Amino acid sequence: MYPTNPMRAETSGDTERVIGNWPSIKKRRDELIIATKVTGEGHKFVREGAPISASTIQSAVENSLRAMNTDYIDIYQLHWPNRGSYMFRKNWQYDPTGQDSAAFYDHVDEVLDQMDELVKAGKIRYFGLSNESAWGTSVWVQAAKAQNRPRVVSIQNEYSLLCRLFDLDMAELCHHEQVDLLAFSPLAAGLLSGKYQGGANLPEGSRMSAMPALGGRINGKV
């Protein structure tokens, strides 16, 4: 797995196009597991920052299939919950009290219906979540069971020696509901690699050169 992120408008979608240009993509497709995501609010250069919905998923899947020159996607993931997330060190300021529970339940039903259509059409095989909480994941899991819709097979959340949030209620939930963790930032954006050396001799082009706080991983105590 080679995770990437469209940090700029001019590079958005480049990874999918690179995969689509692999000479062996068609010949060895059954040997590959390809995962990609639909993003929502946050990246204004992708569908003008529209939230995740059935229509944005449909459009994004078709675009990804064309870009990657493939007939199907193995794991299709929701990049962010529309209601917000505590990832990237926002766990101490995350406040769910203003969220609309009914709107979220309706959103889950709508998206599960869309995922069901895509699975039946052979365009995706499985779907997963990303940057989701234990409560949010449990809603997706239970709704899929109740409606006989495609179940959540994976969740891509941060996990490293410096970020152990998953070890709490998420680990228990994922164990019992058979949801696999696809950990991102296992080296804490490079902090655990030792290459930053306290900010001295900062490697050109590194994450820290572009984001000195490394997504909240560097603060007054770290």
Q: Each PLM stretch: what is its role?
A:
Residues 2-18, 44, 83-84, 134-137, ...:
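Acidic-and-aromatic substrate-binding clefts and catalytic sites of carbohydrate-active enzymes
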Residues 30-44, 155-159:
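A short, structured active-site edge motif that brings together acidic residues
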Residues 81-222:
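Beta/alpha (TIM)-barrel catalytic core signal, keyed to glycine-rich beta->alpha loops juxtaposed to Asp/Glu
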Residues 42-58, 97-106:
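Active-site mouth loops of central-metabolism enzymes
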Residues 65-91:
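Active-site groove signature of glycoside hydrolases
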Residues 1-38, 54-58, 71, 114, ...:
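N-terminal binding-site loop/beta-alpha segment at the start of enzyme catalytic domains
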Residues 29-32, 71-75, 125-126, 150-154:
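Short acidic capping loops at alpha-helix termini that bridge into adjacent secondary structure
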